[in-house]
UniProtKB/Swiss-Prot annotation:
Belongs to the HAD-like hydrolase superfamily. MPGP family. The lineage of its organism: Bacteria, Pseudomonadati, Pseudomonadota, Gammaproteobacteria, Enterobacterales. The keyword Transcription does not apply. InterPro entries: HAD-like_sf (IPR036412), HAD-SF-IIB-MPGP (IPR006381), HAD-SF_hydro_IIB (IPR006379), HAD_sf (IPR023214), MPG_Pase (IPR012815). This is Mannosyl-3-phosphoglycerate phosphatase. The active site is at residue 13. It is an enzyme of class 3 (hydrolase). It comes from Escherichia coli O6:K15:H31 (strain 536 / UPEC). GO terms for biological process: mannosylglycerate biosynthetic process. Its cofactor is Mg(2+). Mg(2+) binds at residues 13, 15, 214. Keywords: Cytoplasm, Hydrolase, Magnesium, Metal-binding. One of its GO terms (molecular function) is magnesium ion binding. PANTHER family: HAD SUPERFAMILY HYDROLASE-LIKE, TYPE 3 (PTHR10000:SF8), PHOSPHOSERINE PHOSPHATASE (PTHR10000). One of its GO terms (cellular component) is cytosol.
Length: 271
């Protein structure tokens, strides 16, 4: 489909895609990460995680210095060499984490919606929920422009909750395991398009794009990619795109980093 020599950007979700949902292992993807690094092809991480959490993972994966998309697109961490861009080192879209917390606390107190946010608990509790170490769990609480929560109410009340958030200029987004509240103007698609445009401006040529994801909140990202890999995941809703042309979209048989590797194998061999 394309070669390792052509201008290319790879956008990848983390949990359930590049990382195993349970063990956080990424070794099955390691050979491809090395090949892409050697070919100077950026792998841009894109997740609901905080930028602090993602910078830690980015270094672990050998991707430090590259841009990344945090908090479902509400935060863009700029590449190290983009220091001349306004907002360096991070661009934040929409209202802040603190402002969203105020809205949620008001809705919970006055309209009695039932949910638990990451701000309601300590890092030990988050470590139990996620399987992370306490030090890593602490990084998940460093939100800048979103709130992560567990919904503990009915589907009917969720519909009402979403309607109220929309009225207030917010959106409710489902991840692989948790729900996320962020500004309605933010999104993985907008963030990815901004990064693509920046690379195009710097190089004078629009790069081909490949995106990989496994959850409903990855759909906006995959919609704006030239090619997309839908990694088999745990979420019952799955991922559904408007354009699922087999020439553009590949659904993997394997989960997590093995599915990630399968997707790369497919698009680099289908020529």
């Amino acid at each position: 489909m394309f070669s390792i020599q052509q201008p290319l950007l790879v956008f990848s979700d983390l949990d359930g895609t590049l990382l195993d949902s349970h063990s956080y292992d990424w070794q099955p993807a390691a050979p491809w990460l090395s090949r892409l690094h050697e070919a100077n092809i950026p792998v841009i991480l894109c997740s609901s995680k905080t930028s602090a959490e993602m910078l830690y993972l980015q270094k672990m994966l050998g991707l430090q210095g590259l841009p990344l998309i945090a908090e479902n697109g509400a935060v863009i961490q700029l590449a190290e060499q983009w220091q001349d861009i306004d907002g360096f080192p991070r661009i934040i879209s929409g209202i802040s984490h603190g402002e969203i917390c105020q809205v949620l606390n008001t809705l919970r107190e006055k309209e009695h919606f039932k949910f638990t946010t990451f701000d309601d608990v300590d890092d030990a509790t988050i470590a139990e929920w996620t399987g992370l170490s306490r030090s890593q769990a602490a990084l998940t609480q460093l939100h800048e422009a979103s709130v992560t929560l567990i919904w503990r109410d009915s589907d009917e009340h969720m519909a009402q909750f979403i309607a109220r958030l929309n009225e207030l200029g917010l959106q409710f987004m489902q991840g692989a395991r948790f729900w996320h509240v962020l500004d309605a103007s933010a999104g993985k698609d907008q963030a990815a398009n901004w990064i693509i445009a920046t690379y195009q401006q710097l190089s004078g040529r629009r790069p081909t794009t490949l995106g990989l994801g496994d959850g409903p909140n990855d759909a906006p990202l995959l919609e704006v990619m030239d090619y997309a890999v839908i990694v088999k995941g745990l979420n019952r809703e799955g991922v559904h795109l408007h354009d699922e042309d087999p020439a553009r979209v590949w659904r993997t048989q394997r989960e997590g980093p093995e599915g990630w590797r399968e997707g790369l194998d497919h698009f680099f061999s289908a020529r």
